[in-house]
From Swiss-Prot:
Function: Polymerizes silica around the axial filament during spicule formation.
Top-level enzyme category: hydrolase
Identification of the protein by name: Silicatein
GO process terms (BP): proteolysis
Amino acid sequence: MAIVYGAILFQIILIACAEFPPEWHAWKATHSISYESEHEERRRHVVWQQNQEYIDQHNKYKEQFGYTLEMNKFGDMSNAEFAELMMCVQDYNHHGNLTESLLADNKFKGRVREYQAPATVSLPETVDWRTGGAVTHVKDQLRCGCSYAFAAVGALEGAAALARGRTASLSEQNVLDCSVPYGNHGCSCEDVNNAFMYVIDNGGLDTTSSYPYVSRQYYCKFKSSGVGATATGIVTISSGDESSLESALATAGPVAVYIDASHSSFQFYKYGVLNVPNCSRSKLSHAMILIGYGTTSSKKYWLLKNSWGPNWGISGYIKMSRGMSNQCGIATYASFPTL
């Protein structure tokens, strides 16, 4: 009787598993994903199928679009769920001039200046600060909406590397836990410039090894003995000015930027030059590190380092349209620290 019961149970399990395609099981295994109930798995599978259909439909015309999409670890989330978890839309239309906006806040006075492009410098056709030794490895913010911390830290890592001639990984967790008095709130979308001000006033930022990332906010555990870099000021880019952004990137190093990343094409981006004409230039939702620019197949692009791990995009990076009237707001709210 026990043997018969066991055989029946095995058949039931086989039938249940057969309801899902092998691609679904492979995707779950690849990303180590499981669900608390069968109901939740069925619901997530429906979303996954819809996303896969969207990706397949786009890729039929990828040559016309100029970029390719791919299923990834965000595949069981709708675009709305993805945006809610990983980003937060903020309207920067009211900011006007970024420098003036920051200086209206007393904590920034005496610490902020606007970038002025050198009059006699000829900019290179291509810039990639990875080859210039100013970019650390691709990191992963996991399920914490703190792209601001990764962008701020990435820009500081770049400035420190260019000053010292070597890279050192700095602590996003230090920013996450300790910049709250400056207006940031852990895993909520906040401001890279608040993070810069924290580093300036605090006398530095710890290294990753002394203050590891845990993807959630805790109490501040900064140790002066663990400091890996300091900062003295903030340089802003004139809002919306891609030419100034290009010059700053080429002459000063990596820049922290905000973009409108709320589109499904960004969620599932794999490679190519992302071109989203209906992107917002003022309602921005995600911070990244701008590390380069160039041209491929006559398409001008910006090269950015994301914080969603090396399996997203081009090994963790993305190329976005350059010289397209500030597409996706890449030059709307851009800044970098000075040492």
